[in-house]
């Protein structure tokens, strides 16, 4: 399998990773699209326009540069963007944004990133924004699971052993598991990418999270008192 695949912006299913250990489907929508599974979480990003997200419990109106996560069926009306379906996972329901202009976390080679939808627990999927300043020639690297991306601003290249791919706003792509790649920007252009990860090695666990760590019993964190922790 090549390191990288890219897709034209068209309504509907773009790529089916259902047989992966982290089963995932990639969609684009333009105008209207229904997502009906009640056994999935839908991560989405609004690329252009304004979209109404209809759910069984509530309706939401989102604009360009906003993002969402829903763990039940949704209907999208208006605008256009991408939806990544993580099959068999129940995430949180949330909306956020607009995406900022720079990341809150330092990454590699001068790049930064932000967790837009963080893992609720260790191992969960997450949605990120990745920011490349001008004149970046990133260190070549791989990832142990797929990365589903969309260019939301600026321009650059994804460099792979097979070829170099031009990146511009609206480009949708997948970097496949263990695919060797790096990103480049010119001296005149920044680049911002939305990136979905189907798993993580980061996040809270039952024995280590802010609520239990900062609950103090006679000077000792409840995280260290096994007999009172919820079983």
Language model features by range: what are they?
Residues 36-64, 148-169, 179:
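A short beta-strand-loop-beta hairpin characteristic of the jelly-roll/cupin
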């Amino acid at each position: 399998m090549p390191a990288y695949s890219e897709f034209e912006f068209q309504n509907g299913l773009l790529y089916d990773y259902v047989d992966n250990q982290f089963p995932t489907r990639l969609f684009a929508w333009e105008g209207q699209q229904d997502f009906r599974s009640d056994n999935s979480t839908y991560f989405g990003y609004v690329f252009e326009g304004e979209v109404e997200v209809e759910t069984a419990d509530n309706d939401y109106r989102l604009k360009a540069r906003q993002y969402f996560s829903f763990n039940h069926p949704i209907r999208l009306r208006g605008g256009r963007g991408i939806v990544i379906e993580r099959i068999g996972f129940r995430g949180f329901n949330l909306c956020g944004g607009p995406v900022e202009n720079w990341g809150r976390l330092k990454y590699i080679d001068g790049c930064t990133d932000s967790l837009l939808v963080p893992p609720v627990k260790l191992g969960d999927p997450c949605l990120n924004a990745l920011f490349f300043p001008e004149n970046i020639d990133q260190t070549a690297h791989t990832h142990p699971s797929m990365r589903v991306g969309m260019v939301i601003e600026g321009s650059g290249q994804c460099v792979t052993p097979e070829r170099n791919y031009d990146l511009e706003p609206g480009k949708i792509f997948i970097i496949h598991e263990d695919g060797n790649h790096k990103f480049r920007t010119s001296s005149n252009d920044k680049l911002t990418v939305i990136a979905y990860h189907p798993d993580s090695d980061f996040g809270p666990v039952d024995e280590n999270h802010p609520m239990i760590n900062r609950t103090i019993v006679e000077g000792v964190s409840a995280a260290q008192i096994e007999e009172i922790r919820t079983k």
